[in-house]
Design a protein with these regions (language model features):
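Core catalytic lobe of class I
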Residues: 1-204
Length: 204
């Protein structure tokens, strides 16, 4: 039901698939995605791939086709979830991390239409590298949004984090599209998921 809600939007439009809804493929013996594998979810494509590799990005989208880019890349904070899950590329030397971000952001910039918006979740401790990588590839940050969670994340720092910053802007070249109203603020209050069972830092 949750996936149907995502694919059908507000539920006012019922979309039908190309096969019988009860015709579900058999679960493979080892249900693990492999690099290069693409899944189609309604009109959407999901790739098991690497957003720093042009060949992977081209499998999903061409130049100047994307209306929006929302990303939650590694924060470079060596995070490990309570269940032991870790994130690849989350503990890199400073200049290597900047280059890693620059590679991914550069490909995203090429995929965006002029005027297309972007949202980049990040760790404030790496704010210089995230903002710098945006600057390096010609993406201008217009605002920094804050996702305020309903509960803190217990950590090792003096102040416990209850928010995550998110860089917001759009690609130059055309006026950007805005789909909200004038009542939106830079603070977005959403409950964090009750458990991070499929990814160490799940978003709502």
């Amino acid at each position: 039901d949750e996936i149907d809600d995502i694919l059908n939007g507000d539920g006012n439009v019922e979309r039908t698939g190309q096969t019988d809804p009860n015709e579900v493929p058999e679960t493979p013996e080892v249900p693990v995605s492999t690099p290069g594998e693409i899944y189609q979810l309604g009109d959407h494509l999901l790739l098991c791939g690497d957003s720093t590799k042009p060949v992977d990005v081209k499998k999903l989208i061409g130049l100047g086709e994307a209306d929006c880019w929302l990303t939650d890349p590694p924060y470079n904070v060596a995070y490990q979830g309570s269940n032991g899950l870790t994130i690849k590329n989350d503990s890199m030397e400073d200049t290597k991390f900047r280059e890693f971000l620059r590679s991914a952001f550069g490909l995203a910039e090429k995929a965006l239409k002029p005027g297309a918006s972007f949202y980049i979740f990040h760790a404030d401790s790496e704010g210089y590298n995230f903002r710098g990588a945006c600057h390096d590839v010609g993406l201008r940050v217009r605002e920094c949004l804050v996702w305020k969670k309903n509960a803190l994340v217990l950590g090792r720092q003096d102040y416990q984090w209850i928010h995550e910053p998110c860089l917001y802007g759009w690609k130059d070249g055309e006026a950007h599209n805005w789909y909200g109203d004038r009542a939106q603020t830079t603070v977005m209050e959403f409950n964090k998921p009750k458990k991070n069972d499929v990814h160490p830092t799940m978003k709502p």
